[in-house]
Amino acid sequence: VSYLFISHDLEVISYLADWIVVLYLGEIMEQGPTESVYEPPMHPYTEALLSAIPLPDPQAKTGDIRLEGDVPSPRNKPSGCPFHTRCPRFLGDICVDEEPPTRTTDNGLQIRCHIPLDELVELQSDSATAVRSRLSDESSQEVQE
């Protein structure tokens, strides 16, 4: 049995899905097995979505990634990478002029980004730690309740 569940809340999706597809303006930015999407989040948009997972403690520092810039119209998508107008890791002309390639990691994750995979891994190592911490904090809160 399969079903389509659409949400910006990747934490909820983690309980429901074995495979996650992250879309931006209707285009696939990242997809793969759920655990691969989370550990670490490779695409900058996935990283931003995961950073927005609320913490049970309202006083805790969240480290949210704020996406700046205007959200483009899906009817008039920007050239190049659809996420380039809001990407916190914007590289310049290559992002504006060229569609990003799809790259596949050893664990089956597919990412559309101009940043080379080895650099994405390096950039995301801190994100992965933050996401694991955030998710384990929420899981421990649920157990305590």
Which positions does each model-derived feature cover?
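Short, glycine/charged-rich "phosphate-handling" switch motifs in NTP-dependent
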Residues: W19, Q31
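Charged, flexible cofactor/metal-binding loops and thiol motifs
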Residues: T34-E138
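A short, surface-exposed alpha-helical micro-motif characterized by mixed small hydrophobic
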Residues: I13-Y15
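H-loop/switch region of ABC-family ATPase nucleotide-binding domains
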Residues: S7-H8
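Long, low-complexity, intrinsically disordered segments
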Residues: S140-E145
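Catalytic metal- and UDP-sugar-binding loop of GT-A-like glycosyltransferases, i.e.
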Residues: L23
